[in-house]
């Protein structure tokens, strides 16, 4: 099922998400819907708060990118960044901030502890675009958007666009939610 994407001003995007204690049928269904929603919106990553569920869950699929064709789609639950290395400035965008891009400085490599769809624990190192996408999506789980990480002068430059998104004036090629009625607590989110 394609889920609507919450946007910039929606409260659920500015809250720290709650950890998951396991994967049941509802969470498994949510994961499937998140992948479907991400693909429908031509995204490469999607965090549960973006679909109105304040839980520490994200999905990503970077296989559409030339250097990452062999990287399988990932489900990341309860991620914890253990170490970071290097720095890289790169332009980012976000399904929750449609039509806006901006430069964000992030570590170029991370060591990540997380659980997969089967709730099996992993500790892995990631670099390049995969590290960036993971950090971007993990930020969503911590109530942070990429625009919050932009330099202040760059943020001021896009403020009108952010105001337009908050006012519901920016169209997208995918379903957009107005403030999530579930508040991140509905049955699909548990």
UniProtKB/Swiss-Prot annotation:
List, from the UniProt record, the residues annotated as the active site of this protein. Answer: 137
The UniProt gene name for this protein comes to def
Which parts pass through the membrane? none
**Any one of the GO BP annotations:** co-translational protein modification
Q: What is this protein called?
A: Peptide deformylase
Q: How is the cofactor bound?
A: Binds 1 Fe(2+) ion.
Q: Which cofactor does it need?
A: Fe(2+)
* Chain's role: Removes the formyl group from the N-terminal Met of newly synthesized proteins. Requires at least a dipeptide for an efficient rate of reaction. N-terminal L-methionine is a prerequisite for activity but the enzyme has broad specificity at other positions.
What does the similarity note say?
A: Belongs to the polypeptide deformylase family.
What UniProt keywords are attached to this protein's entry?
Answer: Hydrolase, Iron, Metal-binding, Protein biosynthesis
Q: Name one GO molecular function term.
A: peptide deformylase activity
Tree of life domain: Bacteria
Note the InterPro entries from the entry: Peptide_deformylase (IPR023635), Peptide_deformylase_sf (IPR036821)
Reactions catalysed: N-terminal N-formyl-L-methionyl-[peptide] + H2O = N-terminal L-methionyl-[peptide] + formate
Q: What is its EC number?
A: 3.5.1.88
State where Fe cation binds: 94, 136, 140
According to the UniProt record, what class of enzyme is this?
Answer: hydrolase
């Amino acid at each position: 099922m394609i889920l609507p994407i919450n946007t910039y001003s929606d409260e659920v995007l500015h809250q720290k998400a709650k950890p998951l204690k396991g994967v049941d049928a509802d969470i498994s269904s949510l994961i499937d819907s998140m992948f479907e929603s991400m693909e429908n919106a031509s995204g490469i990553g999607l965090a549960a708060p973006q679909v109105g569920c304040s839980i520490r869950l994200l999905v990503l699929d970077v296989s559409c990118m030339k250097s990452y064709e062999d990287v399988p789609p990932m489900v990341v639950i309860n991620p914890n960044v253990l170490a970071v290395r290097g720095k890289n400035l790169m332009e980012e965008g976000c399904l929750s901030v449609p039509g806006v891009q901006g430069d964000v400085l992030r570590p170029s490599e991370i060591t990540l502890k997380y659980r997969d769809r089967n709730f099996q624990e992993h500790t892995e190192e990631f670099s390049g675009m995969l590290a960036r996408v993971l950090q971007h999506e993990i930020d969503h789980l911590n109530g942070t958007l990429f625009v919050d990480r932009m330099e202040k002068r760059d943020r001021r430059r896009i403020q009108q666009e952010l105001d337009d998104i908050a006012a519901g004036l920016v169209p997208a090629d995918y379903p957009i939610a107005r403030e999530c009625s579930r508040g991140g607590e509905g049955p699909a989110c548990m």
